[in-house]
Amino acid sequence: KKNNIIEIITHKKLYQFLILFRRATLVALLFLSKDYLFAESFKVRALWIVRDFMTTQDKIDEVVSFAENNNYNHLFVQIRGRGDAYYDSKLVPRSHLLNNSNFDPLEYILNQTRGTHIRVHAWLNTYYLWSSPQKPSQNDHLLLQHSDWLDTKVPDEMNVSHMLDKMEKDRKINGEGFYLAPTHPEVEAHLQNIITELLQNYRLGGIHFDYIRYHDIGWGMNPTGLKFFLNYTNGMPGLPVIKIQEKPSFSDFK
């Protein structure tokens, strides 16, 4: 029993430390010198390249040519759209829009800009996983393989087929579609592995994280994530879900 009490206290202290650390980091960023923050602002001319322009060599050549001719020096190229990859990956299924199985769009654009003034950044839709009412064509897509990783408004198992059927009838039913749950530990580990793989295999100018958020207000109730929160806060026995959502500690956790 004594060990259990010590473990609970340790968890609470760790949880409190993480919250304080995040707040302190934000405050520190706000007080950084504006001269430091904006010293390079006029030297950066950037383009965001959506994944539709990353599907063939011809399209990429057009992008690079436009950037060079108009003095753009940073390209944020979208290589993760809806839980898929526009690069060679052992972790993420290849986009169905890439017809040539031997073509690596990210490697190609890096090669085409080598020796130029252009830096290529990887642009990822981080938690946004799927938006179509139709199932992904890739059998190894996370929507089909790990429905338990999806975010939800209520702490119940996500029925993907049922949600897709409802979206087919009314696109407003599920909003933007499906998101991964930021509160799920395995989701965080998976995303970290994706970033590690990119950094190990490609010489990138940087990584641009898009959709690094929840689906909307009221989301964040993935069952596994909720259990993780309750363990760190010593639980809230018998407390209705709606009351847990109102707790400031739950907002901090999210």
Go through each PLM region and give its residues.
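Catalytic domains of carbohydrate-active enzymes, especially glycoside hydrolases
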Residues: K59-D84, Y202
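Active-site-proximal loop/short-helix segments
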Residues: W130, P136-Q138, K169, R203-K254
